């Protein structure tokens, strides 16, 4: 949540005052960063490259995070984006093997899936990346401390080391980059459930899985486990999963999940979990009973700020525990800053990297920079994936100052016509009729994330629908549909409600 922003002039004055103070006060570091995830490492390296003396602390490495373990690389590298994507790749091969038969591949005998082998490969990769991040810090002359950091003053950080000893360091600037952690709802028997942390490191593959949640983590793990052969039941509170995404895309994702064999339970929660000899008995909010080998709670994440001593120092937090910052990522304490999930702005790794880069440029690069949150693309790596950039149809109508034009293309991908898989792709463009600018794009289908990255550049540059139309497509490809949608699917009059075709 943003607090009152400093103007560029105020920021420069504050920076000048800080420089003045530096001549009178000696600090151990120009910058001390708490948290060596994507945002923290980026801020540390770029600040050091600008001449700053930088220290950073991070909890000891472990695939499953807790209050006392973590690891350089943070959630994305160790227990988030990277290991999850590896499992998505692994799960996708199941369907690919089925589809291969109609492409002439004779697959004789049983095709077995070895969960433990994939798990080991995943662990090897995150260890490799963990070491790369450490080398990046070392190469930038950033001093890395292993231990838990907490702020004990406007310019002082205390690090509790592995052996329990505490060492304090002073710094002209302190950056909070501690990320977020998974949370569990307080349902009876909740201790029997796991979060996404544990889901990435299960010793045994679950043959029966129940997932509670309707967000991207929930649908991704449902897709992963189903793709690997598990029976999966997905429970969520709304009528459709993926609240906040385009409704038409949400409906297609739901159909695809069901088409892949996932049992959907909309407008349903879990009431109780009970340990039995046969597994975990799950009672739904409608009184139905299920049995599972694993129950995943994918019900949101909270800022990882509880143990930082922020309130004692006077740093303002919102009700969820997120650090309040201005447009430059500065807190109400001039020497303390925060980036990434700890601020609960847009909780994506590339956004944390952007915020960290802006921080380094502002504080040590002499170039005050504000993070730009417009047209941030994102993807949900369900199978097949969903990717979006800009406004959904619903958001466009809400913010409209004139009529909105919606262009859609739904089709069976060329690959599916031979394999026989009945799974449509859908592409969508939202256009402001008054300016002809494309203000939103969505795609659900194979390679959606790879395609959407290019579309995001176009939206960032302010591309018009006419410019899309004048672009020559790559044929045959799914991507060419984005430049061949000539006919308006529907026009939404100013102040009207969106109407989807589903």
UniProtKB/Swiss-Prot annotation:
Keywords: Cytoplasm, Disulfide bond, FAD, Flavoprotein, NADP, Oxidoreductase, Redox-active center. It is found in: Cytoplasm. The active site is at residue 475. The lineage of its organism: Eukaryota, Viridiplantae, Streptophyta, Embryophyta, Tracheophyta. Induction: By paraquat and ozone. The active site is a redox-active disulfide bond. One of its GO terms (cellular component) is mitochondrion. GO terms for biological process: cell redox homeostasis; cellular response to oxidative stress; glutathione metabolic process. This is Glutathione reductase, cytosolic. FAD binds at residues 38-39, 58, 75-76, 84, 149, 341, 349, 475. Binds 1 FAD per subunit. It catalyses: 2 glutathione + NADP(+) = glutathione disulfide + NADPH + H(+). Glutathione binds at residues 38, 133. Homodimer. Belongs to the class-I pyridine nucleotide-disulfide oxidoreductase family. NADP(+) binds at residues 214, 217, 220, 237, 243, 300, 379. It is an enzyme of class 1 (oxidoreductase). Its EC number is 1.8.1.7. It comes from Brassica rapa subsp. pekinensis (Chinese cabbage). The keyword Isomerase does not apply. It comes from the Eukaryota. Disulfide bonds join 76-81. InterPro entries: FAD/NAD-bd_sf, FAD/NAD-binding_dom, FAD/NAD-linked_Rdtase_dimer_sf, GSHR, GSHR/TRXR-like, Pyr_nuc-diS_OxRdtase, Pyr_nucl-diS_OxRdtase_dimer, Pyr_OxRdtase_I_AS. Its cofactor is FAD.
């Amino acid at each position: 949540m943003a607090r009152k922003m400093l103007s560029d002039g105020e920021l420069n004055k504050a920076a000048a005052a800080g420089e003045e103070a530096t001549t009178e006060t000696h600090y151990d570091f120009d910058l001390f960063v708490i948290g060596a995830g994507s945002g923290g490492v980026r801020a540390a390296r770029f600040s050091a490259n600008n001449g700053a003396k930088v220290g950073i602390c991070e909890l000891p490495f472990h695939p499953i995070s807790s209050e006392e373990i973590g690891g350089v690389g943070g959630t994305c590298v160790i227990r988030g984006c990277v290991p999850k994507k590896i499992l998505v790749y692994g799960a996708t091969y199941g369907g690919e093997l089925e589809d291969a038969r109609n492409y002439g591949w004779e697959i004789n005998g049983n095709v077995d899936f070895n969960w433990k082998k994939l798990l080991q490969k995943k662990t090897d990769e995150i260890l490799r990346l963990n070491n790369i991040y450490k080398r990046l810090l070392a190469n930038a002359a950033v001093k890395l401390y292993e231990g838990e950091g907490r702020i004990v003053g406007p310019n002082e950080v205390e690090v509790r080391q592995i052996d329990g000893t505490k060492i304090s360091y002073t710094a002209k600037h302190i950056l909070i980059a501690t990320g977020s952690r998974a949370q569990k709802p307080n349902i009876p028997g909740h201790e029997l459930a796991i979060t996404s942390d544990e889901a990435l490191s299960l010793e045994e593959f679950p043959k029966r899985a129940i997932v509670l949640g309707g967000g991207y983590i929930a649908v991704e793990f449902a897709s992963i486990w189903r793709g690997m052969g598990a029976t999966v039941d997905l429970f969520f509170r709304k009528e459709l999963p993926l609240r906040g995404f385009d409704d038409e895309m949400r409906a297609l994702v739901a159909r695809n999940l069901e088409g892949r064999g996932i049992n959907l339970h909309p407008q349903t929660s879990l009431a109780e979990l009970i340990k039995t000899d046969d597994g975990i008995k799950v009672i739904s909010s409608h009184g139905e009973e299920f049995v599972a080998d694993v129950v995943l709670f994918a019900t949101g994440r909270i800022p990882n700020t509880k143990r930082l001593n922020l309130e004692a120092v006077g740093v303002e937090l919102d009700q969820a525990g997120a650090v309040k910052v201005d447009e430059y990522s500065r807190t109400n304490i001039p020497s303390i800053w925060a980036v990434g999930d700890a601020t609960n702005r847009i909780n994506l790794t590339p956004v944390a990297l952007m915020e960290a880069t802006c921080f380094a440029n502002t504080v040590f690069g002499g170039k005050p920079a504000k993070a730009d949150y417009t047209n941030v693309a994102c993807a949900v790596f369900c199978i097949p994936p969903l990717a979006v950039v800009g406004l959904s149809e619903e958001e466009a109508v809400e913010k409209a100052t004139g009529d909105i034009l919606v262009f859609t293309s739904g089709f069976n991908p060329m690959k599916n016509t031979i394999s026989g898989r009945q799974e449509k792709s859908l592409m969508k463009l939202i256009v402001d009729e008054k300016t002809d600018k494309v203000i939103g794009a969505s795609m659900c289908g194979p390679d959606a994330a790879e395609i959407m990255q290019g579309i995001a550049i176009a939206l960032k540059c302010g591309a018009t629908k006419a410019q899309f139309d004048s672009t020559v497509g790559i044929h045959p490809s799914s991507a060419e549909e984005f430049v061949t949608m000539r006919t308006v699917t529907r026009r939404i009059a100013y102040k009207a409600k969106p109407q989807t075709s589903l």
